[in-house]
Amino acid sequence: MKVPFKWLKDYVNINISANELGDRLTLSGSKVEEIISSGDEIQNVVTGKIEKIERHPDADKLVVCSVNIGKEEPIQIVTGANNMKEEDIVPVAVHGAVLPNDVKIKKGKLRGIMSNGMMCSEKELGMPESGVDGLMILPSDTAIGKDIKEVLDLDNAVIEFEITSNRPDCLSVVGIARETAATLGIKYTMPKLDYTPKNKANIKDSLEVEIRDDLCRRYMARGVKNVKIQESPEWMQERLEEAGVRAINNIVDITNFVMLELGQPLHAFDGRQITSNKIVIEKGKVGEKFATLDKVERTIDESVLCIKDGDRAVALAGIMGGLNSEVKEDTKEIILECANFDGTNIRVSSKKLGLRTESSSKFEKDLDPNLVEIAMDRVCHLIEELDAGEVMEGTIDIYKNPIKERNLKVDSNWMNKFLGTDISKEDMKEYLDRLELKTDVEGDTLNITVPTFRSDIVLKQDVAEEIARIYGYNNIPTTMFNSVSKRAGKTLKQHLEDKVVEILIGSGLNQSISYSFVSPKIFDKILIPKDNDLRNTVKIKNPLGEDYSLMRTTTLASMMEALSRNYSRNNSYARLFEMGKVYIPSQDEKVLPEERNTLVIGMYGEVDYLNLKGILENLIEELNIEKSSYKRESEHPTFHPGKTAKLYVNKEFAGLLGEIHPDVLDNYDIDEKCYIAELNLDVLFKNANIEKKYKALPKFPAVDRDMALLVDDEVLVQDIESIIRNKGGKILEDVKLFDVYKGAQIPEGKKSVAYSIVYRMPNRTLTDAEVNKVHDKIVRTLENNLGAELR
């Protein structure tokens, strides 16, 4: 935000330079980005009196002037201007002078006559043109030889501030004046607000206002009759120009002036155009066309808040007025609007419409609704002062939920301990009073009343920040901590997550990351039925778009998107995993959704179900999860029936793994088989143990036996393994499946499964007879229970 230094001095008596003030304000928390001095572009231009004018001997349109610039001898200047006479005082750019736009002046000959400089016009000095064609003629009592910047008061600095979103009270010249006064320990003066309605007509008799949406927190309207549209006074135009705002006419300029001065946007409607005598504040209609003051027709929708004349939009609330209610040269009656709107809605609407204005940039920060009346009074005062019209009697003010001051109690001893200072409570009170935080001291307690314009002060820590910045951060002594800080370590969950990543990358997988918000269309793509609980989602109020409008309840679609993207780019294989969250809504709206930590693994290309299962078994083993089992799953719509399993850990459901249903693959344009596992990490981590346990190497040899069985295709390998472990007894050390085969030499409807079995006792050597007895028992049980045949 740009604040002209001269304008700032209208409200606070500053006796230091703009640069020094910038340094002081930056140290007190109001960051100064840049200080621009308008006079820096002008160098070596002084006032001079024309003592003699003679015709140029070789040019009819040129004259030769003798100009006194306060030196011992006058200088000679050749010019083509013709609006000056002898004894006139003019700006003179001498040899070596610099003018705006980096124009350098050098002495030289014009048609054979030496010219030692140039006499300047208003345009050449970069000043607003008054309409005079030719040189700038200065008052006759102007001192000779003076720097033109001093004479014309051109040496005005503009200070540019970076205003953070939590300080909307600083989005104005008065707000910066308040900060300046607090920083320098002096008083500041509020602008005059008093006025007397000169027109006895009451606006309440001719206008009605209705707020139909809570996005408008307050709306105030006043009327002005017998309006005189004319140019604003020079001082106002100058202030606006310095702040980067173009002067238009007195009414528009007054509203812009007050917006910059107090930080509260206002708008003036041509009273003739409010034909329904009723202003309505409500959202627009889908596809509604509306032409704004910049003469651009825009399409609005039901999310954009509008100011309407009955059913007809006349302004985009908080953004820009409409061309259909613009104040014109023949306007005789205006309706003044001063309101407060929801900042989030203004920001979203402004972005959607591609229209960001000075007004919207202020409303985006959530302004204080109590500023509305102050700004309206100020506008009425200026209309009266500039004789721009007659303010009507009465005020329409709709303010349903008034914002009130906040009260805080802070212990002064806590404050010093928190800041590491030794500030007296009396000084604390003084610092807070400077910032208009009215403070009473009661013992060691500071009773603070926070004004409504300081919405950022909520906690005692916020008060501490205010005291620290006025006291001076640079004045706070450097001290050692009173306590010993301990370096924070990772949580068990973080260690487990790191372990999972390490295991899966070691298994040849690549980690992927996807958005947690998804499209409603994903459920159809992965064949989730309409009544399935997975479709009960958390909906985002302000989504980036429909494709990102829901919080996901499953990671299956996210992984399918990743596999599809790889497949579409002709990658012959993909091995991916992602650790993320799914969001399960609570039945009670007051309870936050459950955030479930999830691991999803996806792959295609020269892999099968057993590859995926092997990765999971390795993961379970590395996490030291003791009891895991699998059960057939045939009902999940996303997976191929008969080629899917449920994983249980300690009898608790931990996830699904299997081959993806062909119809799902078609929906993602994938022509290869894909395999996915979706696991509940919370269940895995609850049963994991990453502490390393060591045991002595076995002292006695093991007996290894391989077993190849012919079984029906429907027999689960888990059932086979369960029998082996149960019947193996205490001498069984380990059992592993190492082959599953179907094809040549295997009857139809059958499969061959092969296991490696290890027998061992920790305290003695096993005999062949002992091993054979147990091994034969296992084979008989498999034959009797599962119809297995030993190959």
Curated annotation (Swiss-Prot):
Gene3D superfamilies, alphabetized? 3.30.56.10, Bira Bifunctional Protein, Domain 2, Ferrodoxin-fold anticodon-binding domain, Nucleic acid-binding proteins, Phenylalanyl-trna Synthetase, Chain B, domain 3
Q: What CDD domains would the database entry show? A: PheRS_beta_core, tRNA_bind_bactPheRS
Which cysteines pair up through disulfides? They are: none
Catalytic activity, reaction form: tRNA(Phe) + L-phenylalanine + ATP = L-phenylalanyl-tRNA(Phe) + AMP + diphosphate + H(+)
Top-tier EC class: ligase
Entry note: cofactor: Binds 2 magnesium ions per tetramer.
Compartment(s) where it occurs, according to its Swiss-Prot or TrEMBL record: Cytoplasm
What does the record give under GO molecular function?
Answer: ATP binding; catalytic activity, acting on a protein; magnesium ion binding; phenylalanine-tRNA ligase activity; transferase activity; tRNA binding
Annotated ranges, domain tRNA-binding: 39-149
- Does ATP-binding show up as a keyword for this record? yes
Signal sequence segment: none
Residues that hold Mg(2+) according to the record: D456, D462, E465, E466
* Family that this chain belongs to: Belongs to the phenylalanyl-tRNA synthetase beta subunit family. Type 1 subfamily.
Name it: Phenylalanine--tRNA ligase beta subunit
- Organism the protein comes from: Clostridium tetani (strain Massachusetts / E88)
